[in-house]
Amino acid sequence: MDNKAGLIIFIIILALLLIILPVLSSIFTDFLNRYIFNLSLVPDNFLLLTFKNPQTYINFFTRLSPSNMLCWGVIGLFIIYSLFGQLSSKNQKRYLRKDDYGSHGTSRFQSPREIKNNYFKYNSGWFLGSDKPNLTYHVGMAGAYQPLHGNLNMQIAVFGSPGSYKTTAFVLPNIFHIPFIYKNTPEKADLIITDPKCELYSLTAKYLKSQNYEVRVLDFLNLKYGDSLNPISFISGDKELMEIAEGFINSSSVSKNAYSADPFWEKSESQLLGALIGFVKQVYPKYQQTFSEVLKLLTSQNVRDPQKAEVFFTDYCVKGSALQLWNNYLLAEDKVRANILIGLATKLKLFSIPGLINITETSTMDIKKIGRKKDKPMALFILMPDNDKTFSPIINSIVTSILSQLYKTAASLGGSLASPTYLILEEMANIGNIPSIEMMLGTMRSRRIYPMLVWQSLPQLKNRYSDYWEDILSMCDTHLYLGINDDFTANYCSSSLGDTTIKIQSTHNKTSSILPDDSPSQSQNYYMRKLLLPDECKRLPQSGLIISQRSLFPSILSKVQYKYWNKKDRICAPSFLEDLPEIPISN
């Protein structure tokens, strides 16, 4: 029966009930009260008179009597039952989550009690968010935290598309929160922060200074303000030499050409760069051990001329891995050497920029102090452009140098740092490929190094670490999804959340008339379903975030923004880069 026919029949039956029931109610009332069930007193045309009398229908709707109330109930039940039958489809289907049944999967979201137990007991760890919506961040607030001394490591991978509040709801709150954790403890934590656009420094520097932090800045935005750092000066072994060289080459912003598309060229350039850095370290005085001197050396006749190159390193008594790398370079034919030289010279052309020479010529800060006990903890901001990867190679070299130095410091202190060090690597794709990061992540916890790796998407990570991206993710016990735009990240997120079991219940109603003339038949079936489908991951509300952790069910929390644009919500006044001292111009 179609809806139109059913409606017509419904109206007809309702009209008949509204005619017949008032007459029946009136007859019953009269028989009871007036005629007292004596048929001899009933007029011959009593039924017709009752039917035609308007007072019959007026009394039905205005008088409260048992017979009227009974008839009203009949009409009401008819309306409810008829509407229920018409609005319900012939085949009703719905599904229920049945992870407790678990025939096809047991994944589910954490219950409110589990969330409280897992994230709200302690505040000594990364700040994650809240179980309450629409909150504004303030230091020390009640919220969800990844416990510092819990069973999971503190290595966290964060993914958020542009506009997903990565900075305001995650990075900024944690810069404020980390000093708060150690406020009343003997030890203090050091901070290493990569800062696109100088936003993080501007919004947090005064707060950090108020917490007795020594705030340092490496300015790769203007190449003008703050500190300078020469990564070559901190190289103390062959392994570090090669890590610096490999990181620099792999992170080059130069577009791939016919040669660099082949890994042979990048490896050859890395070997040559490592050899030249080793030469500078062994032969030049300390003040000349710089990247700009490496560039000068590369373009000198001693390197360019094939005959002079054969004896160049031996004439200066260069030894160790530097000599071996140089000999590897000499094995190539002259034409191949020329291409290697051109490729490396193109990548080192950065060091013809005066500002970059100034910022890498000397070191006004000592990264050997990071992780050690000292009077003031250190917060280092590495400012970098968010729309230009020109300086990615040298930024990569600096981050690589800092990580290597942290491991050396930990080794000198018995295996772990005296002061825990937090790495907040915002826009990590702009740093490039950090050598051996997948191996370091496996040992950072024991060294008391706690990294936060922030990406816009999984394809960014895969692009930078094509062979190791899954290793990097597996070393991070916590994955956060703040917002997803691309299919690859959505599919990965959906897959990592796991499968659950759903029950689909089908109800078949036979509705050939206005009232079902047969009892409903039901069937139940169990199926597998992703806890969240990829499209559902992409439709995550702007205010929400997904937490996926090893050994725990996933959960969805609310983001908590630091609303610095509202003066009443500011934790500190903004700082300005121009207030920092300018870097002296190199001679």
Where are these regions (language model features)?
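Short alpha-helix boundary/capping motifs
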Residues: M1, R372-K373, I472-L473, S521-Q522, ...
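Basic- and hydrophobic-enriched, low-structure N-terminal and domain-boundary segments
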Residues: M1-P173, I181-E187, K510, Q522, ...
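P-loop NTPase motor domains
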Residues: P22-S26, N33, P147-I449, R464, ...
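General secondary-structure edge motif
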Residues: S107, H138, A142, G150, ...
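A short glycine-/small-residue-rich loop at the edge of a beta-strand within enzyme catalytic domains
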Residues: R113-Y122, P393, M428, I484
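N-terminal short leaders/motifs
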Residues: D131-Q146, A322-V336, I502-S506
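Low-complexity, polar-biased intrinsically disordered regions enriched in Pro/Ser/Thr/Gly
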Residues: L135-A142, S253-F264, I504-N525
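Conserved ATP-driven motor cores of ASCE-family P-loop NTPases powering translocation/secretion/packaging/pilus
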Residues: L441-I546
